[in-house]
Amino acid sequence: MSQVIDIVSLYPKDMNIYGDSGNVLTIQRRLALYGYEPRVHAYNQGCDWPEHVDMILGGGGQDTGQKKIIDDFFQRADLLRSLAADGVPMLMICGLYQLFGEYFETVDGTRLDGIGVIGAYTVGQNVRMIGNLVEHSDQFGDVIGYENHSGQTFLLSLIHI
């Protein structure tokens, strides 16, 4: 029998605007290829939290989606901080990335406090930033990605990748 890997997908109902479920499917597939048995727990507002968590994935949502989940999210904040401190791997994209930071300020000036797992804050802009990215890391080589967002993120401390 293969080792089970419990994956929590955070708020897939409200925070999946750009097909972030594809990240969940990709992680599931890669784990299965390496002989693991991935088990995905979709956590939405009002759901029970799973007993065991090996990894957490979170996606993007419009500002309205973030406002919709924020109360429930803060009820889970201490648990999420504790899991992060324990080294549980987490991949946060877009809106949940912003909420894992210190705060997110929308274009209209509304400030949504985050839970402070990531030492950064994000400020919404009137112009979207869209396009391919290539950054070089001494540790990982070229890191290739794609951006499509209106928020500009500022690091509070230097992070090396």
Model regions and ranges:
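Fold-independent oxyanion-binding glycine-rich loops
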Residues: Y11-P12, Y43-Q45, G59-G61, I93-L96, ...
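Conserved anion/nucleotide-ligand pocket segment
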Residues: S137-L155
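N-terminal beta1-alpha1 cap of cysteine-dependent amidohydrolase-like domains
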Residues: M1-A85
